[in-house]
């Protein structure tokens, strides 16, 4: 079982409310660093890792145990180099991630993005409230060591480019620190 001390490359979690740019940024980070990208929603759909259908949210409920079993070998590897995109973080073991990025977005912009995706008013309201209260940032800070949690703004193209560079810097810092220790 890998730990940050034994991993050669960092595992990175990109989290935030739906519509903050997690998938876009996660994929860009993985491509730029030559890492593997795991888009949890896609893994769930393609590997039947969901439970019952939730009528209120108009989606299937994630079977967390199935998901964790499905991805654990990759995230427990000493090689590292995995970027995971998911809108939550408290279900993942703390040992899996070396960098946790929480994307934030102004609520007006988030509302527009979710509306353009066809989200119901109920789902939009839930996600906007989550963003207003900083629920996912708080969850990340409670689930992981605060020194690996990074809050980044994700409203503009320029911010997305800056976020890509910042995450690549963090990955480089991890690699440098762990190369010196070994």
UniProtKB/Swiss-Prot annotation:
Residues 1-20 are annotated as: Disordered. Keywords: ATP-binding, Cytoplasm, Kinase, Nucleotide-binding, Nucleus, Ribosome biogenesis, rRNA processing, Transferase. Monomer and homodimer. Interacts with small ribosomal subunit protein uS11. Not a structural component of 43S pre-ribosomes, but transiently interacts with them by binding to uS11. One of its GO terms (biological process) is ribosomal small subunit biogenesis. This is Adenylate kinase isoenzyme 6 homolog. InterPro entries: Adenyl_kinase_AK6 (IPR020618), P-loop_NTPase (IPR027417). Its EC number is 2.7.4.3. Broad-specificity nucleoside monophosphate (NMP) kinase that catalyzes the reversible transfer of the terminal phosphate group between nucleoside triphosphates and monophosphates. Also has ATPase activity. Involved in the late cytoplasmic maturation steps of the 40S ribosomal particles, specifically 18S rRNA maturation. While NMP activity is not required for ribosome maturation, ATPase activity is. Associates transiently with small ribosomal subunit protein uS11. ATP hydrolysis breaks the interaction with uS11. It comes from Caenorhabditis elegans. Residues 116-126 are annotated as: LID.
């Amino acid at each position: 079982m890998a730990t940050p001390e034994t991993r050669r490359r960092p595992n990175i979690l990109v989290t935030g409310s739906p519509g903050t740019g997690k998938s876009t940024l996660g994929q860009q980070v993985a491509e730029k660093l030559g890492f593997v990208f795991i888009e949890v929603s896609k893994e769930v759909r393609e590997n039947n890792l969901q439970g019952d259908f939730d009528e209120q949210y108009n989606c299937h409920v994630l079977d967390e145990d199935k998901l964790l079993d499905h991805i654990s070998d990759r995230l427990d590897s000493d090689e590292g180099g995995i970027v995971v995109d998911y809108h939550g973080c408290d279900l993942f073991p703390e040992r899996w991630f070396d960098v946790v990025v929480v994307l934030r977005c102004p609520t007006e912009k988030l509302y527009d993005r979710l509306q353009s995706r066809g989200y119901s008013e109920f789902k939009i309201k839930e996600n906007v409230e989550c963003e207003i209260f900083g629920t996912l940032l708080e969850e990340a800070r409670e689930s992981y060591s605060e020194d690996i949690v990074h809050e980044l703004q994700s409203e503009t193209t320029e911010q997305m480019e800056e976020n890509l560079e910042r995450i690549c810097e963090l990955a480089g810092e991890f690699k440098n620190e762990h190369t010196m220790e070994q």
